[in-house]
Structures are given as structure tokens and as C-alpha cells.
Amino acid sequence: MNSIWEQAEALSPQIIAQRRDLHKFPETGWTEFRTACIVIKKLRQLGYIVHFGADVIDGSAMMGVPSEVSLRKYMQRALNEGADAELVEKMQGGKTGIVAVLDSGKVGKTIAFRF
């Protein structure tokens, strides 16, 4: 495979399967525990240094956070759907944000993408 298009085409079935899986288990804002676990594991697998939970989210700046009772319900739902218990526990209070760092070893600018 030479071109990026050929590489993307080869990954297409995996990407489609992942998208369909995520759509089977929709999660609203501050309750994306299952999705965050999937993203964290994939980023680590790809070699990123991953920070999440209270390390990257300022709880005092969060708006529209569900009640603690609701958050507990969504955390349990994520666990029932296969989320990693250790990761979910670190996202207490709906702190489902993730920051991934890829150190290229080269001097230069830092680029951030937010999704």
C-alpha cells in the first residue's frame, strides 16, 4: 500500500465497525464513560501519553452536568456495556475529557486538536 487513500480504504471496515458500535451505545454530555474508555485505550495503543478526568477537566468550569445520581447510573451503564472499571472510576463527576500527547522528539510547535 503506497497511497494514503489505499491505507484509508484498508482501514474502512474497522472504522465503520467502530462507528456502528459507538452509535449502539449513545451517551450525552458529561456521561461519555464508555466512549472515553474506548478512546483512551486506542490512543494508548497508538503510543500516545493520555491524560483524562480531573487531570484535564476543571470541575468548577463544567456546565450542565447531570446530578450525581444520574452520573452514577451512567457510570454503571458503561460498566455493564464493557467499559474499563479503573478508567471509569477516574472520571468521577462526569469528567470524561481526554488529552493525548504524542511526543515526536522534535523541537517545534505543539498542536492540539479538540473534538
List where the protein language model places each region.
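Acidic/His- and Gly-rich active-site-bordering loop/insert found
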Residues: N2-F115
